[in-house]
Amino acid sequence: MPLTIYTGGAKGVDTHVERLCHLYGHACVVLIPPCHPRAKSLVPLTQSDLDAATPTVTQVAFRLGRQIHHSISLQYIQRNYHVIQPASLVLALSHFDEYRKHLLGGTGWSVVMLSY
């Protein structure tokens, strides 16, 4: 049964997942914010798409006790909302900080978004 895989289009795991989807006949939807370098070759999310994620991102920030200090970081976390939202199965890969208490990058945010 063909699957639809949602990815954020980053180098590394996301790129590998895109190749595997094409190899095995699965659909791959690459969701990126307008600031992403690949936005020229793919259709990026619109600002209204990103804004739709803001209420959930705000709740997740409160739950994690974290703040977003850069608009580009915000766009990537908003993008992750659109990767997580339609998912029935999530495979999250990341690195822990040196104390193994926090996931680095936006992956931790995405995992918490699963409960919203």
Can you name each region flagged by the protein language model?
Residues 1-116:
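Acidic/glycine-enriched connector segments
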